[in-house]
Swiss-Prot record:
Origin species: Staphylothermus marinus (strain ATCC 43588 / DSM 3639 / JCM 9404 / F1)
Protein's UniProt name: Large ribosomal subunit protein eL21
One example GO MF annotation: structural constituent of ribosome
Similarity annotation: Belongs to the eukaryotic ribosomal protein eL21 family.
Keywords attached to this entry: Ribonucleoprotein, Ribosomal protein
Ribonucleoprotein listed as a keyword: yes
Record keyword Ribonucleoprotein present: yes
One Gene Ontology term, aspect cellular component: ribonucleoprotein complex
PROSITE patterns noted in UniProt: RIBOSOMAL_L21E
InterPro entries hit by this protein: Ribosomal_eL21, Ribosomal_eL21_arc, Ribosomal_eL21_CS, Ribosomal_eL21_sf, Translation_prot_SH3-like_sf
GO biological process annotation, one example: translation
Gene3D superfamilies according to UniProt: Ribosomal protein L21 (2.30.30.70)
């Protein structure tokens, strides 16, 4: 037997797959043009067609708070268990949370 690879995207076959009508690399421009402010709540929804600024699969589906901006990416603070994590995520992988 050969040892299975343990890359950054291992075990993401179902998590990072798109439905047939969603396929293609370009996300909706309305999602990219949203300007998030510090304190805004966002959902982390990974777009698997865009690899830049993609968070790890463990953060897919989590909700966090915008702290600031660094370059084109946003600094997002989330709670994972009893720890607070700081992530740098590009807007292609963020959705505004409805308050």
């Amino acid at each position: 037997m050969v040892k299975a690879p343990r890359g950054y995207r291992h075990r993401t076959r179902k998590v990072f797959s798109k439905h047939i009508r969603e396929k293609g690399a370009v996300p909706p421009l309305s999602l990219l043009m949203i300007d998030y402010k510090p304190g805004d709540k966002v959902h982390i929804v990974v777009n698997p067609a865009i690899h830049k600024g993609m968070p790890h699969r463990r953060y897919h589906g989590k909700t966090g708070t915008i702290i600031g901006k660094r370059g084109k990416a946003y600094i997002v603070k989330i709670t994972l268990g009893d720890k607070e994590k700081t992530l740098f995520i590009r807007p292609e992988h963020l959705r505004p949370a409805k308050a």
